[in-house]
Amino acid sequence: MQQIQRDIAQALQVQPPFQSEADVQAQIARRIAFIQQCLKDSGLKTLVLGISGGVDSLTAGLLAQRAVEQLREQTGDQAYRFIAVRLPYQVQQDEADAQASLATIRADEEQTVNIGPSVKALAEQLEALEGLEPAKSDFVIGNIKARIRMVAQYAIAGARGGLVIGTDHAAEAVMGFFTKFGDGACDLAPLSGLAKHQVRALARALGAPENLVEKIPTADLEDLRPGHPDEASHGVTYAEIDAFLHGQPLREEAARVIVDTYHKTQHKRELPKAP
């Protein structure tokens, strides 16, 4: 199993475990510089990111805000901005956490787009949903939610001349735990290559409250399973996923689940097929 662990870790460009606080600070500086370079290369000056209330978007948001603040200071150009976007579906169960994230990030600008009416209007027009079992329909609509959020973020970025930030990291990438062309769609992914505990380490070092750093992760896309934990969907824990990514020992069954899921979701990590 160790060779497949190494192969997958290499494919996902997994970063080595942090050995010290200096390693954490180095990763923060590296990723802020990456965000800044993406803006410079694009010729654009605005960043857009959806804030969910989870640690991933919180961490990416903190990095983004620091990136534009530093650019303003370095260049004197006040046009560099970060827009944090709330994209609730109706009333979000953990709205308090989302608001706490916004208060922590203190973005240059905040916008709210309730995706509920758009999701409902589209679902009502889809004949393919008719007659589906409730759980299957709920799952499909959950992916619609993720894709509507993508549309909203790109609309804002298009209107304001900006780039959309993604929150994907190695622990989600290995499990394919994102919606294809939904939350998997972005212009830059500053958390790439990080294990889940490393994302938390960055969040903690950036000043995030501990209750948000250690919050139980949930995609919260399905109405029939509100607040359903990521780990319950995975069938393995994030600690096991992180151990796998870093080539450390873990339960044989957990390793098998991760490898099987990685292969099953490979299409999500590839460009569209072409002749």
Swiss-Prot record:
It is an enzyme of class 6 (ligase). Disulfide bonds: none annotated. Catalyzes the ATP-dependent amidation of deamido-NAD to form NAD. Uses ammonia as a nitrogen source. GO terms for cellular component: cytoplasm. Belongs to the NAD synthetase family. Deamido-NAD(+) binds at residues 143, 147, 180, 187, 267-268. PANTHER family: NH 3 /GLUTAMINE-DEPENDENT NAD + SYNTHETASE (PTHR23090), NH(3)-DEPENDENT NAD(+) SYNTHETASE (PTHR23090:SF7). SUPFAM superfamilies: Adenine nucleotide alpha hydrolases-like. One of its GO terms (molecular function) is glutaminase activity. Keywords: ATP-binding, Ligase, Magnesium, Metal-binding, NAD, Nucleotide-binding. Pathway: Cofactor biosynthesis; NAD(+) biosynthesis; NAD(+) from deamido-NAD(+) (ammonia route): step 1/1. It comes from Pseudomonas aeruginosa (strain ATCC 15692 / DSM 22644 / CIP 104116 / JCM 14847 / LMG 12228 / 1C / PRS 101 / PAO1). One of its GO terms (biological process) is NAD biosynthetic process. It catalyses: deamido-NAD(+) + NH4(+) + ATP = AMP + diphosphate + NAD(+) + H(+). This is NH(3)-dependent NAD(+) synthetase. Its EC number is 6.3.1.5. NCBIfam families: nadE, PRK00768.1. Mg(2+) binds at residues 56, 172. Homodimer.
